[in-house]
Amino acid sequence: AARAMLQHGIFNDALPLKMTYITPCYRYEKPQSGRYREFYQFGVEMFGAPSPAADAEIICLATTLFERLGISNLSLEINSIGCPTCRKNYQAALKNYFSAYKNELCETCVKRLEKNPMRIVDCKNSDCQKISQNAPNIIDFLCEDCRKHFDDVKKYLDNSNIEYKINPKIVRGLDYYTKTVFEFVAKDDAQRGLVCGGGGRYDG
């Protein structure tokens, strides 16, 4: 979305800019249950909105969308993954923690240990998940600015009567996210844990 806006000069318009899109996408990863190689992605973007109110607005919009589609058996989970400064200390703490379990991690996470240990927290391998249960949480490493931003997001959601739970294990799979991240997770037994939607802030 950002590339399209730059290409067509849309950033010349007044900020914040809001847009929506639907497009076919492809995953460069091994297909899994509920995660196909090709899929359609519907999304919304808000550019030029640094306020935590913008994060809450996107989450409220997603909540309303699911409600109008009649999809109610979902749990909204939120987290903050901070800024690059926060994550530097967090990554170091994770590397120190997971190094003690290196022989028990899956092959992919052994590689992640050196490149991006945050991704180990998001691994779907059952052994890695068990090890991650006692791993350090990013919330404990947030700087003052990121902590206030997250507190404000929660206040906006509370004022909008949006139910949520904080899940410190949400890191999302894309490295450009900063501060707020969220996921809508299926609660029914057949699809428990399936992420039906999600996103987050990215301050480029």
Which residues does each predicted region cover?
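TRNA-recognition modules of translation machinery and tRNA-sensing kinases, especially anticodon-binding
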Residues: 1-204
